[in-house]
Structures are given as C-alpha cells and as structure tokens.
C-alpha cells in the first residue's frame, strides 16, 4: 500500500478528523507500508510548522523505526514521475503524487492510502485501470 502525505498527517495527529479511519487502514494492513521520500519531506514540513519540532522528531523516529517501507527514488523514478506530472499538468499534482504513482507500479499495488481524492481519482496506474483509494 502506498501512503500519501495527507494520510500520514492524519495518522500521526489524533486531532485530525480522519485519524481513526487512517489508523485502522495502517494498523490492520498486511501489506508493506510504502512511503516516498517526497511524502516524508512534505510530512516533515507540515508537522514542524503546524505542531513543532518535538512532534517532527517523534514522527521522524517512528518512520525510521522499521515498520515503514521507505522507498528510494533515483533519477529513473524522477524521470518517470516527471512524465506523469507532464501528462496530468492540468491537475497540478506535483512530485509527491507522481512518485506515488511510480511507486505503486514498482510495488505492484493499486492501493493508495490518501485523503487527496481529487488527485487520485484523476490519476491512473501506469499499467492502466484505476487506483483503489482508501480509507
């Protein structure tokens, strides 16, 4: 399962309205919990600016703890993501969402845990079809 920034923000912040639904998806998943470096960067910024450095450090330590599949994105993945950004440029999706599409292909999954239904209802898997967007 590919996990987007919005879902991780809800997971790590119990005050978020979707915290329980996202937590259930993560805590009950038998799939790898795949997180891109771009999602980590977005999450780090949001937590640091909204909540503070202590929360930021707690999130980073949790992500580094081994339960999460921290995916690598090299030049080939960035090039592939750039093609996706080009294809969907009217949607203004950005590198984080495009990398999630690339990683979904690499990990052979169509399941995306996100609260960003607008983008992921428009985006398509590289191999065709549709993503399964949860929660």
UniProtKB/Swiss-Prot annotation:
UniProt cross-references to CDD domains, sorted A to Z: PIN_MtVapC26-like
Pfam family, one: PIN
Uppermost EC category: hydrolase
GO BP, sorted A to Z: negative regulation of growth
Keywords: Hydrolase, Magnesium, Metal-binding, Nuclease, Toxin-antitoxin system
GO MF term set: magnesium ion binding; RNA nuclease activity
Domain of life: Bacteria
PINc domain mapped to chain residues: 1-118
Keyword set includes Endoplasmic reticulum: no
EC number: 3.1.-.-
Cofactor(s) demanded: Mg(2+)
Binding annotation for Mg(2+): 4, 97
Keyword Nuclease belongs to the record: yes
InterPro entries: PIN-like_dom_sf (IPR029060), PIN_dom (IPR002716), VapC_family (IPR022907)
Function: Toxic component of a type II toxin-antitoxin (TA) system. An RNase. Upon expression in M.smegmatis inhibits colony formation. Its toxic effect is neutralized by coexpression with cognate antitoxin VapB26.
Family: Belongs to the PINc/VapC protein family.
Protein's recorded name: Ribonuclease VapC26
Native source organism of the sequence: Mycobacterium tuberculosis (strain ATCC 25618 / H37Rv)
Gene that this sequence comes from: vapC26
């Amino acid at each position: 399962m590919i996990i987007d920034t919005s879902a991780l923000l809800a997971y790590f912040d119990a005050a978020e309205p979707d915290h329980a639904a996202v937590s259930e998806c993560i805590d009950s998943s038998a799939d790898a919990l795949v997180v891109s470096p771009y999602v980590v960067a977005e999450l780090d910024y949001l937590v640091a600016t909204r909540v503070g450095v202590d929360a930021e450090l707690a999130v980073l330590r949790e992500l580094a703890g081994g339960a999460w599949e921290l995916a690598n994105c090299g030049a080939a993945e960035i090039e592939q993501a750039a093609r996706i950004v080009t294809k969907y440029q009217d949607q203004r999706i950005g590198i984080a969402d495009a990398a999630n599409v690339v990683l979904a292909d690499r990990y052979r999954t169509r399941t995306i845990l996100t609260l960003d239904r607008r983008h992921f209802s428009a985006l398509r898997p590289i191999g065709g079809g549709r993503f399964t967007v949860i929660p």
